[in-house]
């Protein structure tokens, strides 16, 4: 990819092709030994806790501060690091947005240098092309694995930092729009469910609780067979 087909006005330079490792100061994965669950303490993030582009703290568990302190830095991502699920559920990404977080071996940590913003890298790795490449390169039998030794050798397309920022802003705005419309859709679905309960008689009642103006007669109770013909296929 030298240049994208659609581009913001004012940008004409070729995009650079770089191995992902050229844009990283660190790529690793988390702890392998079991760690205890606690009621409070540092967050313990596994692949199942990365969903819809974010860390899902409602499913994540805590671990003890003592065990967290004993971990090496490779298991303790910093705010702004990119997480990538590498075992089981593959290719999901999230940017670390809290301190005192640790990851297990099902999650890779990618720390980007000045050549590539983490937000741009996340947007890029979420595209169908790079998702497919990571899945195609995955190994294993029943449970698939993404190998970080293959991930960091992937070639990625890197524009200048200002264009990276424009792209990130554009797709963030689209995500916000999707979220807004999804919320409205959920509200309409809830309204429909509510009205289905209120606009049909319940528990052998003769009239529904909510009704269109001008209709007052009781509803008739009939067997379905009186109204339709039922045939076996």
Language-model features, listed with the residues they occupy:
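A short beta-sheet element
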Residues: 46-48, 57-130
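Proline-centric
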Residues: 9-14, 109-118, 149-168
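Non-catalytic DNA-recognition/assembly elements of restriction-modification systems
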Residues: 9-29, 211-233
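Secondary-structure capping and domain/repeat boundary segments
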Residues: 73, 118-159, 200
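A short glycine-rich beta-alpha junction/loop motif
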Residues: 2, 86, 101-108, 139-163
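Short amphipathic coiled-coil heptad-repeat segments
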Residues: 1-12, 183-217
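DNA target-recognition patches
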Residues: 21-25, 34-67, 102, 225-228
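Extracellular/lumenal glycan-associated surfaces
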Residues: 163-177, 181-183, 220-222, 226
């Amino acid at each position: 990819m030298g240049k994208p087909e659609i581009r913001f006005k004012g940008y004409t330079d070729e995009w650079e092709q770089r191995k992902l490792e050229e844009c990283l100061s660190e790529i690793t994965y988390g702890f392998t030994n079991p760690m205890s669950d606690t009621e409070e303490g540092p967050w313990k993030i596994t692949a199942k806790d990365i969903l819809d582009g974010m860390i899902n703290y409602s499913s994540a568990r805590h671990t003890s501060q003592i065990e967290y302190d004993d971990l090496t830095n490779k298991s303790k991502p910093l705010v702004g690091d990119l997480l990538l699920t590498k075992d089981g559920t593959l290719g999901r990404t999230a940017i670390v947005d809290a301190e005192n977080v640790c990851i297990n071996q099902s999650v890779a940590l990618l720390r980007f240098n000045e050549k590539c913003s983490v937000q741009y890298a996340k947007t890029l790795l979420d595209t169908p092309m790079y998702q497919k490449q990571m899945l195609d390169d995955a190994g294993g039998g029943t449970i698939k694995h993404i190998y970080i030794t293959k991930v960091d050798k992937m070639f990625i397309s890197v524009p200048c930092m200002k264009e990276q920022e424009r792209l990130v802003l554009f797709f963030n705005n689209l995500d916000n729009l999707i979220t807004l419309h999804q919320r409205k859709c959920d509200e309409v679905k809830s309204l429909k469910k509510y009205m289905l309960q209120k606009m049909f008689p319940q528990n052998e009642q003769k009239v529904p609780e909510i009704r269109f103006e001008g209709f007052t007669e009781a509803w008739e109770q009939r067997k379905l067979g009186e109204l339709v013909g039922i045939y076996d296929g």
